[in-house]
Amino acid sequence: MAESVAARVASLRRFLGSPSGGACVLLLASLAGFVLANSPWAAGYTALTTTPLTLSVLGKRGPDTIDAWVSDGFMTLFFLVVILEIKTEIVTGHLSSPRRVALPLIGALGGMIVPALTYLLVTCGHPEATRGWAIPVATDAAFTLPIILALGRHVSAGARAWLMALAIFDDVLGIVVIAVFYGNALYWPALAAAVVVTAALIGANRIGIRTVWGYATGCILLWIALLGSGLHPTLAGVITGLCLPATALGRNVGQATPLDRAASALTPVVTWVILPLFGFMNVGVSLRGIHPDMMVDAVPLGIMSGLLIGKPVGVFSATLLSTRLRIATLPAETSMGKVFGLSLLCGIGFTISLFIANLSFPDSGLVIPAKMGIFAGSVLSALAGWLWLRFSPEQ
């Protein structure tokens, strides 16, 4: 009996420490937000997410509610972890050579351009709707990884690594889009301060400073400066991640690097706290007044088309072209048929897509239809990808 209990506890710990465990918590938190928003306690849920909590920097209004703090503040750590993941892969992982980097990067570029064009094609003639062109460009690794792990032998280890690298590149490209296209009017003194802090972080790396707390302080100062500058403050996580040293020096060689220590400390926080909070705050869409025919309106139809059609077409065609031109090679035990199935899974756009939807339609009635399009497109993409990879004949 004791051995049985111990085995179950060990199994639970393994699950909680796995990507699938994190995805389950994110899904449960998101469902909780959705259920509360459509329950008799909807008013309490709305009051919680919109609780005033205002910050102003240099005359620029910052996050003013709890859900805004989650999106503009806590999500900075999510973007930081994304950058740390890709740096780790480049230094020691599956992206440690240019040819290994090329395939997922080219696929991610195709998976960004074609969905955006698909969305713009569907929403042409609706000027306000076109602001959401970037919503279908990102892939959510938190949900794609558990699906391909559940497929087991149907997806090779090399194919899994390729999809995860592509999803990370997708997130990075999404961050670039946010920084470039979704900022406010620039305030140059604050932008100059952000440049100074960035230069200090780069200098700290160059002169061999390996104290993580120094970079954490720099990240906070950079976040404040970016908030005042008009650029999106979550860019602070990206810049700090790029500046964190990936190597140890001197007597510390062989020990954990600052990058490793930061990733070890932040990944559980992001997985178990920040992403579930984000899902809980952003998926609480009330269905009151929403009719099925609203799903064919420009915004949700454009998002669904971008995720379900644009994503797989963009990723697959870019990957096929890069292999035909011998720019990159497919992973071992991976056919173009498998690539197509994995390309379908790339249409699972959740975290970044919701994030961009909030930025695209602030204080607009279009944000709820946008979220409905994200949910529908992501679910259909997950189902289509799973069915293809599970039941299609080997190519």
Curated annotation (Swiss-Prot):
Name the catalysed reactions. Na(+)(in) + 2 H(+)(out) = Na(+)(out) + 2 H(+)(in)
Q: Mind listing the GO biological process terms from this record?
A: regulation of pH
Which cell locations does it reside in? Cell inner membrane
What this chain does, per the entry, is described as: Na(+)/H(+) antiporter that extrudes sodium in exchange for external protons.
Q: Read off the InterPro entries from this record.
A: Na/H_antiporter_dom_sf, NhaA
Family membership noted in the UniProt record: Belongs to the NhaA Na(+)/H(+) (TC 2.A.33) antiporter family.
| Membrane topology of the entry | Multi-pass membrane protein
The protein depicted here goes by the name: Na(+)/H(+) antiporter NhaA
Biological classification of the source: Bacteria, Pseudomonadati, Pseudomonadota, Alphaproteobacteria, Acetobacterales
